[in-house]
UniProtKB/Swiss-Prot annotation:
<dbReference type="GO" id="GO:0097449">
    <property type="term" value="C:astrocyte projection"/>
</dbReference>
<feature type="binding site">
    <location>
        <position position="8"/>
    </location>
    <ligand>
        <name>a divalent metal cation 1</name>
    </ligand>
</feature>
<feature type="binding site">
    <location>
        <position position="38"/>
    </location>
    <ligand>
        <name>a divalent metal cation 6</name>
    </ligand>
</feature>
<dbReference type="InterPro" id="IPR018064">
    <property type="entry name" value="Metalthion_vert_metal_BS"/>
</dbReference>
<dbReference type="GO" id="GO:0043197">
    <property type="term" value="C:dendritic spine"/>
</dbReference>
<dbReference type="GO" id="GO:0030517">
    <property type="term" value="P:negative regulation of axon extension"/>
</dbReference>
<dbReference type="GO" id="GO:0030003">
    <property type="term" value="P:intracellular monoatomic cation homeostasis"/>
</dbReference>
<dbReference type="Pfam" id="PF00131">
    <property type="entry name" value="Metallothio"/>
</dbReference>
<keyword id="KW-0007">Acetylation</keyword>
<feature type="binding site">
    <location>
        <position position="62"/>
    </location>
    <ligand>
        <name>a divalent metal cation 7</name>
    </ligand>
</feature>
<dbReference type="GO" id="GO:1990748">
    <property type="term" value="P:cellular detoxification"/>
</dbReference>
<dbReference type="GO" id="GO:0071276">
    <property type="term" value="P:cellular response to cadmium ion"/>
</dbReference>
<dbReference type="GO" id="GO:0010628">
    <property type="term" value="P:positive regulation of gene expression"/>
</dbReference>
<dbReference type="GO" id="GO:0050821">
    <property type="term" value="P:protein stabilization"/>
</dbReference>
<keyword id="KW-0479">Metal-binding</keyword>
<dbReference type="GO" id="GO:0008021">
    <property type="term" value="C:synaptic vesicle"/>
</dbReference>
<dbReference type="GO" id="GO:0008270">
    <property type="term" value="F:zinc ion binding"/>
</dbReference>
Amino acid sequence: MDPETCPCPTGGSCTCSDKCKCKGCKCTNCKKSCCSCCPAGCEKCAKDCVCKGEEGAKAEKCSCCQ
């Protein structure tokens, strides 16, 4: 399975767990893990935020809070 995709539907469940790198993850069971790189106080993190795992200085940039 491509680590950049997530097979589950909106609100579904999947095996992302703590290693979620899905760009469009909408799984309720791994949303918090997807947003672990968000800064404190980012209200969007609990909604549709997904971390973009890159290397170096751009590592763990958050799609909703950069």
